[in-house]
Protein backbone atom coordinates (compact mmCIF):
# COMPACT_ATOMS: atom_id res chain seq x y z
CA UNK A 1 0.00 0.00 0.00
CA UNK A 2 1.23 3.48 -0.80
CA UNK A 3 2.51 5.57 2.08
CA UNK A 4 0.59 8.83 2.36
CA UNK A 5 2.87 11.85 2.09
CA UNK A 6 2.62 14.42 4.83
CA UNK A 7 2.33 17.95 3.38
CA UNK A 8 5.03 19.20 5.78
CA UNK A 9 7.45 16.55 4.42
CA UNK A 10 6.92 17.82 0.88
CA UNK A 11 7.58 21.41 1.93
CA UNK A 12 11.02 20.39 3.23
CA UNK A 13 12.09 19.41 -0.28
CA UNK A 14 13.94 21.95 -2.40
CA UNK A 15 11.92 24.14 -4.72
CA UNK A 16 11.95 23.28 -8.41
CA UNK A 17 12.97 26.31 -10.46
CA UNK A 18 13.51 26.64 -14.21
CA UNK A 19 15.24 29.97 -14.78
CA UNK A 20 15.95 29.83 -18.53
CA UNK A 21 13.30 29.11 -21.13
CA UNK A 22 13.42 28.61 -24.87
CA UNK A 23 9.84 29.85 -25.19
CA UNK A 24 9.97 33.41 -23.87
CA UNK A 25 6.39 34.32 -24.73
CA UNK A 26 3.57 31.87 -25.37
CA UNK A 27 -0.04 32.28 -26.43
CA UNK A 28 -2.63 30.01 -24.86
CA UNK A 29 -6.07 29.92 -26.41
CA UNK A 30 -8.56 28.45 -23.97
CA UNK A 31 -12.30 28.45 -23.55
CA UNK A 32 -15.56 26.56 -23.64
CA UNK A 33 -16.55 24.50 -26.65
CA UNK A 34 -18.05 26.59 -29.45
CA UNK A 35 -16.60 29.90 -28.22
CA UNK A 36 -14.44 30.55 -31.30
CA UNK A 37 -11.05 29.04 -30.44
CA UNK A 38 -10.87 27.34 -33.84
CA UNK A 39 -11.59 30.62 -35.61
CA UNK A 40 -9.01 32.52 -33.55
CA UNK A 41 -6.17 30.00 -33.93
CA UNK A 42 -5.33 30.71 -37.62
CA UNK A 43 -5.42 34.45 -36.98
CA UNK A 44 -2.92 34.14 -34.11
CA UNK A 45 -0.88 31.63 -36.14
CA UNK A 46 -0.41 34.17 -38.94
CA UNK A 47 1.33 36.62 -36.60
CA UNK A 48 5.11 37.08 -36.58
CA UNK A 49 7.11 34.57 -34.48
CA UNK A 50 4.13 32.29 -33.88
CA UNK A 51 4.54 28.56 -34.50
CA UNK A 52 2.01 25.89 -35.41
CA UNK A 53 -1.12 25.30 -33.40
CA UNK A 54 -0.41 22.61 -30.81
CA UNK A 55 -2.91 20.83 -28.63
CA UNK A 56 -0.96 20.56 -25.37
CA UNK A 57 -3.23 18.28 -23.38
CA UNK A 58 -0.35 17.62 -21.00
CA UNK A 59 -0.54 21.24 -19.82
CA UNK A 60 -4.21 20.73 -18.94
CA UNK A 61 -3.36 17.56 -17.02
CA UNK A 62 -0.59 19.29 -15.05
CA UNK A 63 -2.94 22.17 -14.19
CA UNK A 64 -5.61 19.72 -13.02
CA UNK A 65 -3.09 17.91 -10.80
CA UNK A 66 -2.06 21.25 -9.30
CA UNK A 67 -5.67 22.34 -8.73
CA UNK A 68 -6.36 19.01 -6.97
CA UNK A 69 -3.32 19.62 -4.71
CA UNK A 70 -1.55 16.55 -6.11
CA UNK A 71 1.58 18.50 -7.06
CA UNK A 72 3.15 21.68 -5.74
CA UNK A 73 3.01 24.96 -7.65
CA UNK A 74 6.77 25.07 -8.31
CA UNK A 75 6.68 21.55 -9.77
CA UNK A 76 3.62 22.33 -11.93
CA UNK A 77 5.15 25.58 -13.20
CA UNK A 78 8.48 23.95 -14.04
CA UNK A 79 6.79 20.99 -15.74
CA UNK A 80 4.69 23.30 -17.94
CA UNK A 81 7.78 25.36 -18.87
CA UNK A 82 9.78 22.23 -19.74
CA UNK A 83 6.92 20.80 -21.79
CA UNK A 84 6.42 24.04 -23.74
CA UNK A 85 10.17 24.33 -24.39
CA UNK A 86 10.27 20.70 -25.57
CA UNK A 87 7.31 21.21 -27.92
CA UNK A 88 8.86 24.39 -29.35
CA UNK A 89 12.25 22.74 -29.84
CA UNK A 90 10.70 19.72 -31.56
CA UNK A 91 8.77 22.03 -33.90
CA UNK A 92 11.88 24.06 -34.67
CA UNK A 93 13.77 20.86 -35.54
CA UNK A 94 10.99 19.66 -37.84
CA UNK A 95 9.97 16.85 -35.50
CA UNK A 96 6.41 15.97 -34.48
CA UNK A 97 5.12 18.11 -37.34
CA UNK A 98 1.64 17.41 -38.69
CA UNK A 99 1.43 17.17 -42.48
CA UNK A 100 -2.16 15.84 -42.64
CA UNK A 101 -3.72 18.32 -45.02
CA UNK A 102 -7.12 18.91 -43.38
CA UNK A 103 -6.12 18.81 -39.68
CA UNK A 104 -6.38 22.08 -37.77
CA UNK A 105 -2.82 21.64 -36.50
CA UNK A 106 -1.45 20.87 -39.99
CA UNK A 107 1.34 22.92 -41.56
CA UNK A 108 -1.08 23.52 -44.44
CA UNK A 109 -3.32 25.53 -42.10
CA UNK A 110 -0.41 27.87 -41.33
CA UNK A 111 0.20 31.08 -43.28
CA UNK A 112 3.78 29.97 -44.08
CA UNK A 113 3.78 26.17 -44.49
CA UNK A 114 7.04 26.08 -46.48
CA UNK A 115 9.18 26.90 -43.45
CA UNK A 116 8.14 23.55 -41.94
CA UNK A 117 9.14 21.69 -45.10
CA UNK A 118 12.55 23.43 -45.03
CA UNK A 119 13.10 22.46 -41.40
CA UNK A 120 12.85 18.73 -42.02
CA UNK A 121 15.81 18.97 -44.43
CA UNK A 122 18.06 21.16 -42.24
CA UNK A 123 21.05 19.85 -40.31
CA UNK A 124 19.08 19.47 -37.10
CA UNK A 125 20.45 20.32 -33.68
CA UNK A 126 23.35 22.31 -35.14
CA UNK A 127 21.03 24.86 -36.74
CA UNK A 128 18.15 26.57 -34.95
CA UNK A 129 15.78 27.89 -37.62
CA UNK A 130 14.48 31.46 -37.63
Language model features by range: what are they?
Residues 9-20:
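Pre-Walker A adenine-sensing motif
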Residues 29:
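Hydrophobic anchor at the beta1->P-loop junction of P-loop NTPases
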Residues 23-26:
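Pre-Walker A (Motif I) flank of P-loop NTPase domains
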Residues 56-130:
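PAPS-dependent sulfation machinery
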Residues 35-51:
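A conserved segment at the C-terminal end of the G1
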Residues 1, 39, 47, 79-82, ...:
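Detector for methionine-enriched segments
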Amino acid sequence: MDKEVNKSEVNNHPKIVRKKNLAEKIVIIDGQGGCGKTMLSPIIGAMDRVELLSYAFEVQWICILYKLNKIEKDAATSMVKMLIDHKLYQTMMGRDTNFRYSDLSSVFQNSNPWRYFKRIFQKGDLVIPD
